């Protein structure tokens, strides 16, 4: 479904803002690539950040990988204008589909001056969450995007955004300049488990990964038994590789 079709399906949007639709890509979120994300962020930086008449940007996105794209935009959009990522948990053909109302709320948030300087946000199901913290917890319920540690930035009340506190920058947040970036090296993410073998690491390396992030289930007391052996000396020796 193209962006203009989405806009035309919710005419109430025109009561909130003058909307200009731009089609960056039209793929399922499971097929979103780093190249698409780089192009998207550059377009927002150029068209939205560079135009004083633009209040903000709304990105419609499938929910399979929505939080990943939102986090990327949070790190790469270089202005204080709101970038709102929105999706739907029900298909457009479902009874009481949530997509149209979510889109209306997302446009409302993006058009609201109080939304500035909050980074990229995710808006679904009356919730306003920071893209820096939001996670998807359930593939089958409407209220699935959560901000468990930080909490939500706000919520929609009577069709208007209500923020719980003023804008604040998350601790450790880093801005990334992608103005000269054309592609991003492949980085694989591997999850540790009991009896994990180094073969999974070697396969990632042989398949072309330039970096590997290993999610180790470690407590504060120390390492656990499933840590792969000799990560540095055995894997790094195969080729230049970053392992985190």
Model-derived segments and spans:
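Internal gly/pro-rich beta-alpha loop/helix module
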Residues: 85-158
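Short Gly/Thr/Asp-enriched flexible loops that form oxyanion-binding sites at enzyme active sites
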Residues: 59-81, 224-231
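Short coil/turn connectors at secondary-structure junctions
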Residues: 16-17, 52-56, 78-83, 115-119, ...
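Short acidic, glycine-rich surface-loop motifs adjacent to enzyme active sites
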Residues: 51-66, 207-219
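Short beta-strand segments
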Residues: 59-61, 84-87, 121-125, 191, ...
């Amino acid at each position: 479904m193209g962006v203009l079709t989405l806009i035309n399906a919710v005419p109430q949007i025109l009561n909130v803002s003058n909307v200009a639709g731009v089609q960056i890509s039209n793929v399922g979120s499971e097929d979103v690539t780093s190249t698409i994300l780089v192009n998207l962020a550059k377009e927002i930086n150029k068209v939205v950040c560079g135009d004083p008449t633009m209040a903000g940007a709304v990105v419609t996105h499938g929910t399979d990988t929505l939080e990943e794209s939102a986090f990327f935009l949070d790190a790469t959009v270089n202005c204080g204008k709101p970038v709102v990522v929105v999706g739907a948990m029900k298909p457009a053909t479902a009874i009481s589909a949530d997509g149209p109302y979510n889109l209306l709320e997302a446009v409302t948030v993006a058009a609201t001056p109080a939304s500035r300087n909050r980074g990229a946000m995710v808006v679904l199901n009356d919730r306003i969450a920071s893209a820096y913290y939001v996670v998807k917890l359930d593939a089958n319920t409407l209220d699935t995007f959560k901000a468990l540690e930080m909490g939500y930035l706000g919520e929609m009340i009577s069709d208007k955004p209500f923020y719980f506190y003023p804008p604040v920058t998350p601790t450790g947040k880093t801005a990334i300049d992608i103005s000269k970036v054309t592609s991003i090296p492949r980085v694989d993410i591997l999850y540790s488990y009991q009896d994990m073998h180094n073969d999974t690491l070697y396969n990632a390396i042989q398949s072309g990964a330039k970096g590997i992030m290993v999610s180790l289930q470690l407590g504060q007391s120390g390492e656990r038994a499933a840590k792969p052996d000799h990560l540095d000396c055995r894997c790094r020796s195969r080729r230049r590789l970053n392992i985190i």
